Amino acid sequence: MNELKNDRYLRALLRQPVDVTPVWMMRQAGRYLPEYKATRAQAGDFMSLCKNAELACEVTLQPLRRFPLDAAILFSDILTIPDAMGLGLYFETGEGPRFSSPITSRADVDKLPAFDPEVELGYVMNAVRTIRRELKGEVPLIGFSGSPWTLATYMVEGGSSKAFTKLKKMMYAEPATLHLLLDKLADSVILYLNAQIKAGAQSVMVFDTWGGVLTGRDYREFSLHYMHKIVDGLLRENDGRRVPVTLFTKGGGQWLEAMAATGCDALGLDWTTDIADARRRVGDKVALQGNMDPSMLYASPERIGQEVETILAGFGHGEGHVFNLGHGIHPDVPPENAGAFVEAVHAQSGKYHR
């Protein structure tokens, strides 16, 4: 593999010295870029784009051609694992992801098949290898998965949900069934992320998008417990380098101490968490990633720069900060505003590293 030319992102995750704060954006390869829309149209549909290694590589690299980002993130979807388990993933126009065979019973959980990530999800591994080759060592590549709890929300609800009534009914009425499902999913995520690491991912992230809908007690039992299992099962070194792992629970700002105790390297913060407070609480244990409100990218470049400064000052001097949005970039953000954001982080952060 090529020698890494810019390792700021990996160094920051390990709380090692950097010259400026590294920055990338969740969903940086996406619909706000006209070139992404053109490539997606060429692919035909979203999953065809994910399953074509060359096109997945192309959309992964598109934001890097526009902006001096410090990391690339694999272009894929969090629902690849349930799709590999035979739930029949499809996308309804305007509705988002759906499953034709959702989980409704203990019998459904019992019959979920094991899978080989190099077979059923070989297209993801091909994309990882292709992207690593084409990056030529410019920046590191991030691999990712959904968390067991978040995957379960889609698998039991049959798609997106606002109230999660089917899953919460299972959680309270049949907790043993849900634990069995989550345990199978945790094992699958470990296999999947380790396969991504072996294929070339230099850092991995677990997205717990829906952990924030739980009570604190339920979060620990049904989400965090299984993310802890994943952290324990991951390859933490490859190619002679540490492979950092980041956990991100949207709405999880009240549980940072418990998240940091899993042994992960970094925590993602959404925009509702004060980064200064987060650093006071867990900055001696983990790096922090975040956490500008994605909607700030609708503002003027000047206002974006002010917000960047506020967050940099909130984190303060020293190491262990990866700048990002608090969630994914919105599809109708002007690309030039994303560029202003990236440039502001690099231009304004050097003084915090001297």
UniProtKB/Swiss-Prot annotation:
Pathway: Porphyrin-containing compound metabolism; protoporphyrin-IX biosynthesis; coproporphyrinogen-III from 5-aminolevulinate: step 4/4. It comes from Serratia proteamaculans (strain 568). InterPro entries: UROD/MetE-like_sf, Uroporphyrinogen_deCO2ase_HemE, Uroporphyrinogen_deCOase. GO terms for molecular function: uroporphyrinogen decarboxylase activity. Substrate binds at R27, Q28, A29, G30, R31, D77, Y154, T209, H327. It is found in: Cytoplasm. This is Uroporphyrinogen decarboxylase. GO terms for biological process: protoporphyrinogen IX biosynthetic process from glutamate. Gene3D superfamilies: 3.20.20.210. Its EC number is 4.1.1.37. Catalyzes the decarboxylation of four acetate groups of uroporphyrinogen-III to yield coproporphyrinogen-III. Disulfide bonds: none annotated. Keywords: Cytoplasm, Decarboxylase, Lyase, Porphyrin biosynthesis. Its main location: cytoplasm. PANTHER family: METHYLTETRAHYDROFOLATE:HOMOCYSTEINE METHYLTRANSFERASE RELATED (PTHR21091), UROPORPHYRINOGEN DECARBOXYLASE (PTHR21091:SF169).
